Amino acid sequence: MKGSEFQSKWRAYCRLMRIDKPIGSLLLLWPTLWALWLAGKGIPDTKILIVFVLGVFFMRAAGCVVNDYADRRIDGFVKRTASRPLPSGLISERESKILFVVLVLLSFGLVLTLNSMTIWLSLAALALAWVYPFMKRVTHLPQVVLGAAFGWSIPMGFAAVSENLPLVCWLLLLANICWTVAYDTQYAMVDRDDDLKIGVKSTAILFGQQDKLIIGLLQLATLVLMVTIGWLMNLGGAFYWSILLAGALFVHQQKMIAGRERDPCFRAFLNNNYVGLVLFLGIFISYL
């Protein structure tokens, strides 16, 4: 393979794994860090932290690969996804399957350094990552499955740090599911017209004209659950200030999606990175 061909193939692999679009990895990373800090009541063990951070990026990449493989026959009909490596022919189906297996093996190799409880929970994480891309064909609620997939690092984090799954763990998972459904509905609003044409289901289609209201209710539920977690964990004032700031960001997002236009809806989705960040900073500062 010539140098130029290698570079072209490498760029295609990077695009398939979304290395050029880190937003998904960040949205997966923040709940992971929330869980690790809450479970450890402060900075977790360095080895556990490294394993989870690397695992986030490997599993997010694996999720993108299986998502594009599942959507390979429909992505060409959607404006935003038509140029992806699989529908455009830059990566073959066989190459994508090999890449998925490699990424999963790397992730599982990391998990094997943790306790048995975390290893067993990781099997559910793999199942969720595999199932999610296919759910949009059978239900209007694939975003709920995505929320569980993106949040499964929460029980895994508690298991790795404390070998315990307390009430706070499940409340945090529920908060993350509410938040994920809210921001991924914003994301789905970008593709709603295309999805209607090709028969792909989403919460954006299910919610219809009530989309903004339901997103707002989900955002409110996220904040209420985070307040409850703060109370149960006796977190300091910094955490509650971070919740107020997250609420302000949610209000800003509501303004962005008010016209249901593609670009503002996508910017609202991207804005959720700051929500995850400020909530983590609130937890982090509370344990200083």
From Swiss-Prot:
GO MF terms, alphabetically ordered: 4-hydroxybenzoate polyprenyltransferase activity
Transmembrane regions: 23-43, 46-66, 98-118, 141-161, 165-185, 213-233, 234-254, 268-288
Catalytic activity, EC: 2.5.1.39
Cellular location(s): Cell inner membrane
InterPro entries from the UniProt entry: HB_polyprenyltransferase-like, Prenyltransferase, UbiA_prenyltransferase, UbiA_prenylTrfase_CS, UbiA_sf
Cofactor entry: Mg(2+)
Highest taxon listed in the record's lineage: Bacteria
Functional note: Catalyzes the prenylation of para-hydroxybenzoate (PHB) with an all-trans polyprenyl group. Mediates the second step in the final reaction sequence of ubiquinone-8 (UQ-8) biosynthesis, which is the condensation of the polyisoprenoid side chain with PHB, generating the first membrane-bound Q intermediate 3-octaprenyl-4-hydroxybenzoate.
Protein family membership: Belongs to the UbiA prenyltransferase family.
Protein name: 4-hydroxybenzoate octaprenyltransferase
Organism whose genome encodes this protein: Yersinia enterocolitica serotype O:8 / biotype 1B (strain NCTC 13174 / 8081)
Gene, per the UniProt record: ubiA
